[in-house]
Amino acid sequence: ACADALERLGARVSRVDAGRDLAEVLVRLSPDVCFNALHGAWGEDGCVQGVLETLGLPYTHSGVLASALAMDKTRAKAVLAAAGVTVPGGGLYDRRLAAVIKPNAEGSSVGVFIVEAGANAPPQAIAADDWALGDEVLVEPYIPGLELAVGVMDGRAMTVTEIVPSSGFYDYEAKYGEGGSTHVLPARIPPEVADRARRLAEISHAALGCSGVSRSDLRYDAVNDILVLLEVN
């Protein structure tokens, strides 16, 4: 979609998959600028950004430091909390409470599990020998309510989007599977809550040193009027 839009604007576009030969391909193409449309590990964690900087190629969106920091959920939460942003707690929780377990450095909800109230063991997948998403996992209290997303472009927050998964929670399948979720724009929330969400997204974008475009993911508990920023992409 990004490439199609750029071509409609008159740009000459080469579509490149980020494989092991990425540097070789980029040297051969010698582009004027690289539009980074990657998700998850390598594309969002500063690795590809580092390759582009090493090659001296201009690129869109955030740089190495901001990308690496935003991908590391634990460190990003520390920075955001210091900036006054409400973030979920983290650490050990009473096993009788519902909780969310996720890899510390992954994207697109890969490896995210919701532990229901009363469960006394982590999901079997995390204990399995073939778990390949890192030794560190982040445990957070489960926040009921609405899934919200706020895009920030050049420091300015866009309209708040409400995301409604077809079933369960907003996991990998809900994000990328056909019919996995419905996006409601603008979100069905009070105007003052939308203003708070946009402000949190702008503060977070700046605190992490992001540039270009970012997206903040939030949860809103309408019963208790709690708005929490989960992470910045």
Model-derived features: where do they sit?
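ATP-binding N-terminal substructure of ATP-dependent carboxylate-amine bond-forming enzymes
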Residues: 1-65, 69-71, 75
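Phosphate-binding site of ATP-dependent enzymes
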Residues: 122-199, 226-228
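Conserved metal-phosphate-binding beta-hairpin within the catalytic cores
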Residues: 141, 205-233
